Amino acid sequence: MAKYRIEVVRSAEKTLFSIPKPFVSKIIKAIENLADNPYPAGCRKFVGQKDTFRIRVNVYRIIYEVHDDLILIKVLKIGHRKDVYRY
């Protein structure tokens, strides 16, 4: 299986600066691991969304889209579990 390219939306990238440092490295590692396996154990598909998933990193969530045809993962949002689902 080919490695997926990872693209992080600017707003998600900015959110990393507001997250406490001990969690940032875990979040970055989880995102990097998506390149090898876009459907890791524990990932959940969003209901009503075609290719949108979420993974947990402690109390934080990473919301991302998988584009199998482009071999691309697009990270849409990163945030605390109480805030991340609000649009």
Task: Please annotate each region the language model reported.
Residues 2-7, 11-26, 40, 56-60, ...:
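Enriched for short, Lys/Arg-rich terminal
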Residues 31-55:
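A short, surface-exposed loop/turn module that caps and links secondary-structure elements
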